[in-house]
Design a protein with these regions (language model features):
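Conserved post-catalytic alpha-helical subdomain immediately downstream of the catalytic base
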Residues: 170, 195-258
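Short acidic, glycine-rich surface-loop motifs adjacent to enzyme active sites
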Residues: 80-96
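A structural signal for isolated positions on well-ordered beta-strands in alpha/beta enzyme cores
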Residues: 5-8, 32, 86-88, 117, ...
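Substrate-binding N-lobe of the ribokinase-like
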Residues: 1-42, 254-257
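Conserved phosphate-binding/catalytic loop of the ribokinase/pfkB sugar-kinase fold
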Residues: 33-38, 45-82
Length: 263
């Protein structure tokens, strides 16, 4: 894996303590978690018969107070001044990734030459303007567009080019479920097919894509190669029940299992 720092907002509650315990177990720095007067956003999945029956959300989406935002951004800028190779902004529309915070993160990262990779949410993509990568799925693209698209190569390419032009985003990586992923950048369009397999649970597949993409870019891979690796990692994750973190060895095994044509 890579050295990872988590930054965001939490409450002073059980779910925050539980989160910090998990971070400690996985050797992830939690110093960027800013305590607030709101609950820690928590998603509880109810599983029955190996299927998700429902999900309970514990959250507040009210605007954050300026004092908390200032602490959060000060931390991000401090870390950028030290040594950060990539930033992932994962927007869940819970209040953290507002236009103020997201714009400030992109500007600060670019001042240090650090790429920003966005996992979008909602219809306001103005706040993502200027990002280096964005990784929407078809549903997220359709939440943005007035005229929804189908999951075809032609329509995905058209939507990706629109996103690049309108929001000045350099690279668009569209995750397309059974159709794999499509990477679009200036002068390049790449379709990377998924690998045939049995799918147990798609929970966390998109998170896997953006995490492995960021790790690859931070490690010096070209966009096309990082996207290929991210797609391969997602193919491992969807074979597992529940959210799952793919290991280095599992990724190596998946690479060894590729045919010469796929490689």
């Amino acid at each position: 894996g890579c050295d990872t720092i988590l930054a965001g907002f939490v409450g002073e509650d059980y779910h925050c303590r539980s989160l910090k315990e998990k971070l400690l177990e996985n050797k992830i720095d939690d110093v960027g978690l800013v305590p607030t007067n709101r609950p820690t956003t928590t998603k509880m999945r109810i599983i029955g018969g190996h299927q998700q029956m429902m999900r309970l959300d514990f959250e507040s989406t009210e605007p954050l107070e300026k004092i908390y935002i200032d602490k959060f951004l000060a931390f991000v800028r401090c870390k950028l001044a030290e040594s950060i190779d990539a930033i992932v902004v994962s927007d869940y529309a819970k209040g953290t990734c507002s236009e103020v915070t997201t714009t400030a993160i992109i500007e600060a990262a670019h001042a240090h030459g650090v790429p920003v990779i966005i996992d979008p949410k909602g219809a306001n993509w103005t706040k993502y303007r200027g990002a280096d990568y964005i990784t929407p799925n078809i549903k997220e693209i359709n939440e943005l567009l007035l005229d929804p698209i189908k999951n075809t190569d032609a329509e995905v390419l058209k939507a990706a080019h629109y996103i690049m032009r309108k929001y000045r985003i350099k690279n668009v990586l569209v995750t397309r479920s059974e159709s794999g992923v499509t990477l679009v950048r200036e002068g390049e369009e790449v379709h990377i097919p998924t690998r045939a397999q049995e799918v147990f649970d798609v929970s966390g597949a998109g998170d896997t894509v953006i995490a492995v993409l960021a790790a690859g870019l931070a490690g010096g891979l070209k966009g096309r190669d990082a996207a290929f690796l991210a797609n391969l990692a997602a193919s491992v994750v969807v074979r597992k029940l529940g959210t799952y973190a793919v290991s280095r060895e599992e990724l190596k095994e998946a690479l060894r299992g590729l045919s010469r044509e796929e490689a």
